[in-house]
Amino acid sequence: MRTFWIVAVLLVGVEGNLLQFNKMIKIMTKKNAIPFYTSYGCYCGWGGRGRPKDATDRCCFVHDCCYEKLTDCSPKTARYSYSWKSGVIICGEGTPCEKQICECDRAAAVCFGANLSTYKKRYMFYPDLLCTDPSEKC
């Protein structure tokens, strides 16, 4: 189901933060978010439940929690400014929402980069129905 929503969003041409987040992931991991992070484990992609499968999946869990803490923001579509130099992502100026969304995405991209060694192909396109453990709280 997560994969369906991700593809649907991409087909309608979202130009906001999801594409910016993909670029951050590419900077930090040298991998495209699609297919490597869009439906990985129990939390990477749309929604999430259960326990994160590994450190990479935990990056997505923490990212979801970061988005949940944003009130009156549109984290999946709002655009923000950022730059990078020598592999360091720097969130730029903008509204408080834009800055917070950028920081959530930056932290997740950095987390993915720091945990590349935990990435397991067996968790790519992981079925939601296998995410049955009790969910953790943010």
Swiss-Prot record:
SMART domains: PA2c. Its cofactor is Ca(2+). The keyword Protein transport does not apply. It is found in: Secreted. It catalyses: a 1,2-diacyl-sn-glycero-3-phosphocholine + H2O = a 1-acyl-sn-glycero-3-phosphocholine + a fatty acid + H(+). One of its GO terms (cellular component) is extracellular region. This is Basic phospholipase A2 Cll-N6. The lineage of its organism: Eukaryota, Metazoa, Chordata, Craniata, Vertebrata.
